[in-house]
Amino acid sequence: MAHQSWSVLDAPNPTYLWTQLLVEELVRNGVHTFFVAPGSRSTPLTVAIARHPEAESVLHVDERGAAFAALGVGRAARGPAAWVTTSGTAVANGLPAAVEASVDGVPMLLLTADRPPELRDTGANQTIDQVKIFGDYVRWQADVPPPSDEVDPAYVLTTADQALHQTLRAPAGPVHVNCMFRKPLEPVETEASVAVPTAVDAWARGTEPYTHYPTPAPSPPGPEVDALAETVRGTEHGLVVAGRLDSAAAADATRRLATHLGWPLIPDLTSRLRRGGREQPEQVPYGDLVLTSAAFREGHPPRAVLQVGGRFASKRLRLFLRDSAPEVWAVVRPDPSRIDPDHRVTHHVEAAVPAAVDALVARLEEGPRGTTWRDDWAGASERVGAVVQAHVQESDALTDPLVAALLTEEMPSEHALVAASSMPVRDLNRHAAPGGTGGPAFANRGASGIDGTVATAAGIAEGRDGPVTLLIGDLALQHDLNGLALLQDRPVVAIVVNNDGGGIFHFLPIRKHDEFDPYFTTPHGHDFEHAAALFDLPYHRPDSPSALRSAYAQACRSGESALIEVRTDRATNRQVHDRLEASVERAVEEG
């Protein structure tokens, strides 16, 4: 996008001086992507962004989707993007993404326009109470008054600096800056002026932020590591469970911890360890499916569990750990919030994962190699993998487990993976090919909603400046059809598994009740060919595993976005999962 020549202090009126200061300070702090939804009251923000030479503006008509796209950038880049919207219900559309960002610790800047004080609570058009509208789901919020010659413009700079500090410091999360504007909203000359103090003038001639904050970092590991090391010293029957890990360094450290202890490592899809780790003797990529065997569960209760990183998707694993009642269950993560839905955690180490692992390894002797305990877990996982691979190779029909395994086998190394909530994240966590290539995997598992998934994938592509493979269900895609507009300029290959409704409910007890159909199956009878055409996306509808391989490879080679629709049957899908898990259980127990 072409920009006009930029001088931050060259503003036609006080409103534009403030918005230009705000945008410049955000850019200096590393915010370069602004997701802008159209609106009138936000005109001063939008124009300031459009004119800034280093601000990339992404336009999207759906405020909810734009907010999820900003969330996606934060997930991929671990730094915030800004969401910009006008006043009124437009602001409320940011709540779902703010909730997800808050619960899962994703940095994000909510930049909203508002009416001035004299129009609040007066019945003025498009005016609602936006102060603290996001409640406790934001780490910090500011209600910025209209520009005035009685307020030092340095206030704008220090507010921006504080917002960026609050969104990045542990625990990371969204912040809300609510900006009141009076008319005129357009960049027109007015008689009003704001004096520029010497300090702001000096700042304008430089390139550094006005207020420097230290790089936010979690506390270094302290005495709690000594206590934890003492409790697990000499333990052979332990497990390392890898939840969501946000960096390669954290993933490498977690792998090193398992190797040092000689403990099996059960990785979540979002741990950066679920795929590409087949040669690691401690790796148990099919841990969820191994636990289908009651005999294996009963014979392999861990005495100690080291859970590293954020949440993991497997309910089966969580219940196994709960029922095993380990003497030690420690969570190691750079966040003070608890992950303990079953109230079994005995230790919480709040520290950066690499630092915590270094501290633990330094305090613990190297564990034995080739123990029966480790080999039992790894061997069971290998046998499960053989069953899954046989299903992929022998099936002539497209099934949900096959799609998950096939995509992760074929995924190019430059692609990241995005898994929608509901069945896609579960199928990928269970059936993904462990030896496949590809980049990190992402999923909105903070609040686990299905909304905004397409927009999140687009934001991840934007944030990592690289292609994305998205696996999504039909209801989640219907929920975010507008998000397909964001795929026109960002390479996202979206594979939608269309089983005509809510397939996950076939796995829940409600299926035995009369109200199951249609209240939970929610059949809709639609396909997505016309949706792809509406947004000018190439469309494929493969009818066999070989056709899916071909369509996916073609879409990836193109370097552009595409929509691939895979039709499956909900009832058959449940039967396929049951048969596959029965085969898995036999394979585990026959070992």
Curated annotation (Swiss-Prot):
Protein keywords: Magnesium, Manganese, Menaquinone biosynthesis, Metal-binding, Thiamine pyrophosphate, Transferase
Disulfide cysteine pairs (residue numbers): none
SUPFAM superfamilies membership: DHS-like NAD/FAD-binding domain, Thiamin diphosphate-binding fold (THDP-binding)
BP-aspect Gene Ontology terms: menaquinone biosynthetic process
Name of the protein in its database record: 2-succinyl-5-enolpyruvyl-6-hydroxy-3-cyclohexene-1-carboxylate synthase
Required cofactor(s): Mg(2+); Mn(2+); thiamine diphosphate
Pfam families in the cross-refs: TPP_enzyme_C (PF02775), TPP_enzyme_M_2 (PF16582), TPP_enzyme_N (PF02776)
Gene Ontology terms for molecular function: 2-succinyl-5-enolpyruvyl-6-hydroxy-3-cyclohexene-1-carboxylic-acid synthase activity; magnesium ion binding; manganese ion binding; thiamine pyrophosphate binding
InterPro entries noted in UniProt: DHS-like_NAD/FAD-binding_dom, MenaQ_synth_MenD, MenD_middle, THDP-binding, Thiamin_PyroP_enz_TPP-bd_dom, TPP_enzyme_TPP-bd
EC code(s) of this entry: 2.2.1.9
Function description: Catalyzes the thiamine diphosphate-dependent decarboxylation of 2-oxoglutarate and the subsequent addition of the resulting succinic semialdehyde-thiamine pyrophosphate anion to isochorismate to yield 2-succinyl-5-enolpyruvyl-6-hydroxy-3-cyclohexene-1-carboxylate (SEPHCHC).
Subunit structure: Homodimer.
Cofactor binding note of this UniProt entry: Binds 1 thiamine pyrophosphate per subunit.
Top-level class of the enzyme under EC nomenclature: transferase
Species annotation: Salinibacter ruber (strain DSM 13855 / M31)
Family in the record: Belongs to the TPP enzyme family. MenD subfamily.
Pathway(s) the chain acts in: Quinol/quinone metabolism; 1,4-dihydroxy-2-naphthoate biosynthesis; 1,4-dihydroxy-2-naphthoate from chorismate: step 2/7; Quinol/quinone metabolism; menaquinone biosynthesis
Keyword Protease in record: no
Reactions performed catalytically: isochorismate + 2-oxoglutarate + H(+) = 5-enolpyruvoyl-6-hydroxy-2-succinyl-cyclohex-3-ene-1-carboxylate + CO2
